[in-house]
Every structure is written in structure tokens, then in C-alpha cells.
Amino acid sequence: MFSRKDILVLGMMIFALFLGAGNIIFPPMEGYTAGQHWATAALGFVLTGVLMPFITLVVVSVLGRGEELTRDLPKWAEVLFLATLYLVIGSTFAMPRITNVAYEMAFVPLDIVADTSRNHLIFAVVFNIIAMLFMLKPNTIISSVGKFMTPALLVLLVVVTVTVFISPLSDIVAPSKSYADSSALTTGLISGYQTMDVLAAIAFGGIVARALSAKNITEPQKIMRYTISAGCISVVLLAALYFSLFYLGATSDQVAQGVSNGGQIFSRYVNVLFGKEGSWLMSGIIFLASLTTLVGVTSACAYYFAKFSNRLPYSFWVVVFTVMTTIISENGLTKLLQVTIPALLLIYPVAIMLVVLQFVRAKLPCVKLTYNATIAVTVCFSLCDSLNNVGLLSDGMKQFLGNFPLYDNGLAWLVPALAVMFLTMLVGKKRAV
């Protein structure tokens, strides 16, 4: 029997797994640039940064694991996608980024020790060892994250968000050019990509499925019902938080001059509101957010590679990813963010279309035809976006892509992918006849 308390704990765990430090960093900057359009921009951000990951989480939880999304692709394509997915959200990009965000926003502002490469390494080692201790006992993940870490994190965030609405630092600023010249909703939609939460949901769905299985809940209908119930808790909390952080950014003109990222806005804002105590408050928020996400992401990656390799156990991969994360994090946050974006532009649209295809799969007359054609088209367009980001796309290709709807909004792949999906459905029906 899954009680209301169990649903609450699971919902809090889902909230904590999705709420990484990066999710706290991005909204303030977007709110600052959106200015008077902050609410509309926040709505767009919530659609891609909260609602879409929630839908993905439910789908994957019912399937049992993220790998089921790719079962209709050729084996080589399935392995390539999943390996890329877990590398992006794992020890190559996201996990080292989490470590660096925790160091730069939770440790350095306290001025306990000097900001040196040696101290960075010491922090990275200690921080990742703490996370590893949680992961080596996977049965404690739902209880430790859902019962202890999340409530503490939530209390700290409530203190900040309530204070922001009661005592904003500045009047709401005018929108920047990027928000003034285009739809704030669309710009917010694209900004929501930065959370990488659709990718994370593919990994986290397996964690939720295992948590429910531990309670003897294995029937698809029950899994869906409890995942939706628990997930709604996460959706409400994340949406409320993002709207609050967008408002924080929109009213941050007093402290936002000369900043380069939302983390600096958040840090300065909190310090002005709460003084020296604000540094400790912010450090607590960032540290807990980073730790909970690191535990969830690394655990999901370790489970996947343990299944893929068969002979090497989960604990081995936890140690491997912990060591890799510690080493790669020494490259610094700025460099990691630069190399993450091209990979994200390539894989994110593919992940979205795999979820969309799952909804229509039962009605497809020729499953493999639709899957292969749709994903192939999506990859072609997303690859162009990735190459364009690193300056390797030719002017001719840019001009060609400019003819497609939503190109200026970074969504040139969407219409062709959907068109091919529906076209292959019609072709499949004719073949069946």
C-alpha cells in the first residue's frame, strides 16, 4: 500500500532530483533580461523546464527505464543515443558542472579559505565523496533525499522567495533586446532547455520506477497514477520557485550591473537582503541543491552502465563516475558550460521526439519506419544547430535553414520532425492496406 506520506516523500524526492544548482542559476538572469515580460517568459520556461520533464518522467516510469524509449531504433543508434545522453548528464558535463557550481556559489562566497586550484580540488574530492556515500546505499536514496535533504532545501528557498516578493530591491526593469524583439514566451521556452531536465527525466524515471517497485508497485496503471500524484508535487514546487526567481531577476537592477550569469545575481540579491547571514543561506541552498542532483544523476548513470556491462556492478560505476567527475571538474565552470551547449543542442530535440513518438507508438502502422525517419530528420536539424553554435555551419546552410519555421527561435527541427512523423504514419497505413 502506497500511503499519502509515501506519495509526499516521493514527490519531494522528484523535486530535489530535478532542482539542481543550475536550475537556480538560470532563471534570475532570464528574469533580468525579460524585465517587464518576466511572467510570460517564466511561463515559457516552466513549459519546457517543468512540464515537459514531468511528462517524460511519467512515460519513462511506466516503461520502467529510459532505455525503453529507444527500443525501436537500430541497435547502434540506441547505444549511441543512450551513451551520449548519460555522458551529457553524467561525468562528462553535468556532474562536473554541479561540482563547480557548488564550489563557486556555496563555498567561495563564505571566504573561509582562498579561492585556489588546490582548495578547489580538495572541495571537489570531499563533495563527491559525500555524494558517493549516499549512492553506495541506493535503498537510502528515496529516504535520505525525500525525507531530509529536500525539506531543508525547501525551507531555505521559501525564506528567500517570500522575502523577494515582500521586499524587492528594485523596480522591474525594461526588457532587453532579446525579449523586446521576439516573443517572451518563445524565448522562455528555449531558455528552459538549459535545465537539461528532459534528459535527466529519462534517467530519473528509472529511479522512480525502482522506488515504487520497492513498495511492490509494479502494475503500469498504478505506476502511472502514483508517479503523476507525486510528480504534481514537484511540478507545483518547481513552477512556484521559477516564477519567484524570474521575479527576483526582474527586480535585481540594483545588484545586476556588470554580472555575467544568474548565479551572481542570486548571490548579490541574497547578500543585500540578508547581509552576511545571506552568504550562509545561499551556501546552504546551493550545497543541498547540488548534492541532491549529483546523487540522483550519478546513481542513474551507474545503473545504466551496470546493466550495459553486466560484469561490472553498480558500486564500481559509482566510484568510476565519482573519480571522473572530480578530475573533469578541474577544468572550471566556464569551460564546461561552453562545451556542454553544442552537445545539448544535438541531443535535446532527439529526446523530445522520442517522448512524442512514445505517445503515438500504439497507433503507428509501421513503428520502425516512423521512428527511424523521424529521429533521422531530427538529428540532421539538431546537428546543424550544434555546428552553428561552434561556428562550423556554412553560410549557405544558415540561409537554407532560415526558410524553416521557428528557425530564429532555435526550433527549426520541430516542424520537419512532426511532418515526417505524420507522413510516415500515412505511408505506413497505405502499405498496410
Residues of each region from the PLM?
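Hydrophobic, membrane-embedded alpha-helices of multi-pass small-molecule transporters
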Residues: 9-19, 127, 163-170, 179-245, ...
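Membrane-water interface regions at transmembrane-helix termini and the short interhelical loops
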Residues: 61-68, 128-149, 214-217, 327-339, ...
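Selective recognition of specific alpha-helical transmembrane segments in multi-pass small-molecule
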Residues: 51, 55, 152-164, 198-200, ...
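TM-loop-TM module centered on a large, flexible mid-protein loop between adjacent transmembrane helices
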Residues: 67-73, 241-291, 342
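Membrane-interface loop-to-helix entry segments
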Residues: 136-164, 340-352, 371-380
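Hydrophobic transmembrane alpha-helices that form the core helical bundles
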Residues: 29, 78-112, 287-307
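Hydrophobic alpha-helical segments and their helix-loop junctions in multi-pass secondary transporters
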Residues: 91-95, 154-180, 198-199, 247-250, ...
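A generic transmembrane alpha-helix motif of multi-pass inner-membrane proteins
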Residues: 167, 367-433
